[in-house]
Every structure is written in structure tokens, then in C-alpha cells.
């Protein structure tokens, strides 16, 4: 394993991080002939380290596991780890280094959509493969990216439908609270269109954005309470990302907001983010994901055991983006074996239809739009920082790359197989 850029121990709310050691310089290190190199492109410092450092460790766990089993195509797999430091332009620089200088076969990385958007032109220019493990806003399908997290129809829309229903409390007013960047803004655009189609009036929708790392939540939480005082059942849909979630939830507690009064459903808060928060006043608030550590099945039992043994800390938790990396890495390995090579074009073709029995308890399938079919789960926060699953789909849901709720997306197709061979078109590229 090579690691470039010194890492710092991010404050993962009291969780212990796997220390990373600086070795060689990326600009002078020649390609290693005896290994298959993959890139790990996650922030190990800055505002997103709280979420992304664990994803780096997840890939290292998967690499360790495959090497113990004899490697891939007769070679060891080598992880080349870099730290883009929550700096969006730096993501692109590090991606270019991984592809052009380190000659990695694939990259596993990014969390925020702004980081993914930053690296996308690099992957398309250099024909690299990115496995992106986090829920996002949709509205994209690149032949150089496999999206292993949730699209809006696999998280955001089902969560709002749940809260609108009797089981979820029958919410009538909505606060869409997000960090100010592309994922929250686009997701909320989709949710606003969905809510209005359900005859929710504009006066019953409040939208607010705050910067990354925001901490002064007193005024905004007071505004949420005032908005909810109109008399209709109110719910908060949170697309807040990174370490801003800590003071947000603390201020909810300080303001005496209980889930029975104003439920909050979060799309970027999971077990890792709750690890350092006193959750006794957050019991009953919700998160929507495709996996929770608390689900019971043999595959998840093995996943949790493998993680705790690798990280050498029984208190460390698993979460949804970790499961997405688990699925993505296994699918990449299967595709490489099927293709008999790490060649990007050959592996891409072999990815379609790959199946992995996932820790969620379901079998995930890679579709020709480069998105997974995944189950949807809604969990309630427990006192121990875990989640009780209160609702889930019966079967995996196929991701929509383009939203049926946006008029401008009407007729758009993402299908990278013949005759379409495109990620954003209204007619097939090839016709007989």
C-alpha cells in the first residue's frame, strides 16, 4: 500500500482511525509491475474526513482480504491511497496522478457530488474507472463511473413518501435543510417537484442551505420550530453533509425538538456520524439508506466481523457507504476475473449484470445505466447510536439515473449497451 499526502486523525466523534503512513512521492514513483494497483481517493483531513476516512479503511480491508486469498489474476492488489483533503480541485489533481502516474486499474473514492463532479472530466479524458459509493442526486450517468450508492428514487423519494403516510406520521409541511452544494440543491429540486405534484403548497415547503462545516445552528433551528408552529405536522428532510451534522443534532436537542414533534430524516447521517453524539435526545429521528449495521443476516454478520477484526477495534461501526464499497469492490474483482484483464473497456463490459450478495440481505445487481438495484430502508435512531429498521422495500429497487419528477428529464435514457450506448439521450445512438 502506498499513501501520499500525510493524513491526520479526523475527529470521527470518538472513533479510532486507522493510522496512515507516508511513504513515497506520487510524482516519482514508477508503476509497479508485479501488482494490480487501485486508487483510493477519499478525504483523510478536512470537513469530510469524518465520513470518508472509514471508506479508505474499507477498501484497505477488501484489498487485505483478496490478497490473503491469493490475489487477482495471479497478482497482489496494491492500494495507492491519496488525501484530497476535502479540497474539491485537489480531488481532480489526485485523480490525474492516480490514473496518469500510478496507472491504477480502478479508483474507489469521493463522497460529495462536488468532488465527483471535479474528477469526472479527468476520468473521462483518461478513460479511468471510478467506483462512487455514496447516495447522490442522480442526473448523471458516465461510462467511466459506477454509482454504487443510492439515486433519489432509492432514498429521498421513498423517505418522503414514508413520512407522508400514516405510518410515518402524515407530514403536511416540509423543511428541506441542506449543505450548499450540488447534491442537496438538486435533490431538493426533485423533492420540491415531487411534493408539489402531491399537492403540497409552496407555503408548506421551506428550503435552507448552509456552508460546509456550519456550526451556528441556533437561529436556523429556531426558524424550523417557528415554521412547524403553523399547526400542520412538519418533517425535516436533511441533506446536511460532513461534520456540520454534529452541531445540528446538538442544537435540535438543545431546542427540545423530539422526533414525535418534528421528525428529521437524514440522508447523510449513519452509524459513523452518530458514534460521538449523545443520542438519548435523538431517539426516533430517522435516516434513509440501503443498509444498516443492525440488519440480521449471515452476510452482514460476516461483514461486521471482518471489519472489526481488520480495524482491531470492536467499537467501530459499519454503515451504508461502506457496504457500497464492499459491493463495488467485489463486483470489480468479479468483472476483472470474467474479462481476464484489468483493461478498463473490457472490465466495463463485464460489469453489466454482476451480482453480489450484499450485507443488506439482498442481492445487488449492476445495471446497464451504471447504477445498482438496491433495497431501501428507513431506520430510527436508537440510544446506542444504531438504527431500528422501521420500513423497507420487499425487493431491490432499480436506480433512476434521470428523475421522472423533473420535466426536463422526460424521455432521457441511460443505457451503456447497444443500441443506446449513452448516459443522457432520448434516442438510441445506433439504429439498424
Indicate where each model-derived feature is located.
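Extracytoplasmic "Venus flytrap"
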Residues: 30-58, 82-89, 111-114, 179-185, ...
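Extracellular/periplasmic Venus flytrap/periplasmic-binding protein
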Residues: 93, 137, 144-255, 294-302, ...
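Solvent-exposed, acidic/polar segments of extracytosolic/periplasmic ligand-binding ectodomains
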Residues: 36, 353-432
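Immediate post-signal peptide segment of exported/extracytoplasmic ligand-binding proteins
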Residues: 26-40, 68-76, 164-172
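Extracellular/periplasmic periplasmic-binding protein-like sensory domains
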Residues: 251-326, 336-342, 393-428
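Beta-alpha junction/loop-to-helix N-cap segments that form part of ligand/metal-binding clefts
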Residues: 28, 35, 50-57, 69-140, ...
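Periplasmic-binding protein-like
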Residues: 98-111, 131-133, 173-178, 231-242, ...
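Short, low-complexity disordered leader/linker segments with a strong preference
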Residues: 1-37, 421-432
Amino acid at each position: 500500500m502506498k499513501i501520499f499526502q500525510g493524513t491526520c486523525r479526523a475527529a470521527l466523534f470518538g472513533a479510532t482511525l486507522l493510522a496512515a503512513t507516508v511513504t513515497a512521492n506520487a510524482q516519482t514513483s514508477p508503476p509497479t509491475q508485479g501488482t494490480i494497483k487501485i486508487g483510493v481517493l477519499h478525504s483523510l483531513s478536512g470537513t469530510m474526513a469524518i465520513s470518508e476516512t472509514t471508506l479508505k479503511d474499507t477498501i484497505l480491508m477488501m484489498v487485505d482480504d483478496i490478497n490473503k486469498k491469493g490475489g487477482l489474476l495471479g497478482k497482489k492488489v496494491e492500494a495507492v491511497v491519496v488525501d484530497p483533503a476535502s479540497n474539491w480541485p485537489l480531488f481532480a489533481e489526485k485523480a490525474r496522478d492516480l490514473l496518469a502516474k500510478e496507472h491504477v486499474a480502478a479508483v474507489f473514492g469521493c463522497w460529495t457530488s462536488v468532488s465527483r463532479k471535479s474528477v469526472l472530466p479527468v476520468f473521462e479524458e483518461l478513460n479511468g474507472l471510478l467506483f462512487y459509493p455514496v447516495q447522490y442526486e442522480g442526473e448523471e450517468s458516465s461510462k467511466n463511473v459506477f454509482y454504487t450508492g443510492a439515486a433519489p428514487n432509492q432514498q429521498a423519494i421513498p423517505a418522503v413518501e414514508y413520512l407522508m403516510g400514516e405510518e410515518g406520521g402524515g407530514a403536511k409541511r416540509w423543511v428541506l435543510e441542506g449543505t450548499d452544494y450540488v447534491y442537496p440543491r438538486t435533490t431538493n429540486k426533485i423533492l420540491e417537484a415531487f411534493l408539489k405534484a402531491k399537492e403540497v403548497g409552496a407555503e408548506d415547503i421551506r428550503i435552507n442551505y448552509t456552508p460546509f462545516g456550519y456550526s451556528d445552528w441556533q437561529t436556523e433551528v429556531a426558524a424550523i420550530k417557528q415554521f412547524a408552529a403553523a399547526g400542520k405536522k412538519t418533517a425535516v428532510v436533511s441533506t446536511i453533509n460532513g461534520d456540520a451534522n454534529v452541531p445540528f443534532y446538538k442544537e435540535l436537542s438543545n431546542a427540545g425538538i423530539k422526533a414525535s414533534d418534528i421528525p428529521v430524516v437524514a440522508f447523510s447521517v449513519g452509524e459513523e456520524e452518530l458514534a460521538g453524539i449523545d443520542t438519548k435526545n435523538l431517539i426516533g429521528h430517522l435516516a434513509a439508506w440501503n443498509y444498516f449495521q443492525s440488519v440480521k443476516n449471515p452476510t452482514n454478520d460476516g461483514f461486521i466481523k471482518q471489519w472489526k477484526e481488520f480495524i482491531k477495534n470492536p467499537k467501530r461501526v459499519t454503515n451504508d457507504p461502506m457496504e457500497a464499497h464492499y459491493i463495488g469492490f467485489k463486483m470489480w474483482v468479479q468483472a476483472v476475473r470474467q474479462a481476464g484483464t484489468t483493461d478498463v473497456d473490457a472490465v466495463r463490459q463485464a460489469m453489466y449484470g454482476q451480482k453480489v450478495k450484499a450485507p443488506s440481505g439482498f442481492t445487488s445487481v449492476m445495471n446497464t445505466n451504471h447504477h445498482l438495484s438496491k433495497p431501501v430502508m428507513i431506520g430510527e435512531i436508537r440510544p446506542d447510536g444504531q438504527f431500528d429498521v422501521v420500513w423497507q422495500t420487499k425487493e431491490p429497487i432499480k436506480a433512476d439515473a434521470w428523475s421522472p419528477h423533473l420535466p426536463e428529464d422526460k424521455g432521457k435514457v441511460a443505457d451503456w449497451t447497444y443500441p443506446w450506448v449513452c448516459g443522457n439521450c432520448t434516442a438510441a445512438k445506433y439504429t439498424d
